[in-house]
Amino acid sequence: MPEIPVGSQIFDVVFHPSSAIAYTGLLNGHIKAFAYGEQGDSHNLFSLRPSKRSCRGLSLNGDGSKLYAVGKSKALHIVDTTTTDIDARSAAHDCAINRVKSLMPWVVATGDDDGTVKLWDPRKRDSVKTYTQHFDYISDFLWLDDKKQLVATSGDGTLSVMDVRAKEPKVVAQSEDQEDDLLSIVAIKSAQKILVGTQLGILSVFNRKKGWGDCVDRIPGHPLSIDTLCNIPDDIPDTDPTSTVLTGSSDGFVRVVQILPTKFLGVVADHGEFPVERIAVGGGRYWVGSVGHDEVLRMTDLGAFFHENHVDSDEEEDDEEEWGGIEGADGSEGEEDEEGKAVEGSAEKGGGASSDESDDEDEEMEPQLGDQSSKRKRQPEVELPDPSRKSKKGKKETVIDKDFFDGL
């Protein structure tokens, strides 16, 4: 697993849309760019320091020519990725800016620690719209291109939907208080459902057709907060990209989770005792960049992960088919005994596991239990042991106990 040391804690990472380049925003205010190869080798392209204060958020425009950076300095910095020239909007907010997202060629959104959201036209010096519906920090943004709507999640426990086309700052909808910090957001199922990560480790599912008032489902399993969410590329084979996401948690794991039906697919990266701050997916071999407090950009080959996972699942299916064929070879029909029914009943009652690992084990056990109930082999009659015979441990020979006959 390639690691790129950066020398400071990383707050955010983004990948160039068409080139093998990763950009990182650091605690010491630096923005570092790295070019990487197919084997995970890398070299430094440039290092800038627009501000001496931390860089908390990064976003690239559609063609990767402009890099937008925000942080504790309250400024919006626009970096030309080719010339490394910097155009600054000083005092863009009244407090530290936490998130930034490029929405359209000439529309950029920023969100600060007080919950204020602003829209910018990079060609102008001042913001074009300001939204104040939140009272706590903005944690993440999601852009819904079909409706030209911006969704923001906040530490105040709500998410809000803004129509950027409206002449006046207009909030289309705002959810009820979810009684938990909303930390991350991503769209699934062709953007018909929205997945939100929370401080308590719950994945909340919103259905756009049913409105934004409240979530329609809550998926437990992560032991700690879900700080970041990321979609997987559309063209990874043997996966459903519309329902599979990457999650980054405070426990240091980057997980692959399938949603609706919910299934834990595996761990992509492990940051040890350090929490995962951000995840992004680059091109080429589908490198996943994950960052935390360990001062390294960790690169993981997502394509290889899914390939190995698919091979392992194929081998398991082959083993199950071979095992089932041997069991049915004698032509006897299976009979369900009371033990089998009891096992199945206990498996059904144990469906509400509280961790990803236990959910995975339950789902792996279900098909095995089904095979045992439908093709249970008739058990051979067991011959009761003769009390006059005792067997020595470790040997198959039988020894006659003479004392037994003396007592008759």
Curated annotation (Swiss-Prot):
Its main location: nucleus. It is found in: Nucleus, Nucleolus. Keywords: Nucleus, Repeat, WD repeat. Residues 311-408 are annotated as: Disordered. Residues 313-339, 356-366 have a biased composition (Acidic residues). Signal peptide: none annotated. It holds the Pfam family WDR55. WD repeats lie at residues 5-44, 50-86, 87-130, 133-172, 177-216, 221-267. It comes from the Eukaryota. The keyword Nucleus applies. The keyword Cytoplasm does not apply. Disulfide bonds: none annotated. Residues 396-408 have a biased composition (Basic and acidic residues). GO terms for cellular component: nucleolus. Belongs to the WD repeat WDR55 family. This is WD repeat-containing protein JIP5. It comes from Coprinopsis cinerea (strain Okayama-7 / 130 / ATCC MYA-4618 / FGSC 9003) (Inky cap fungus).
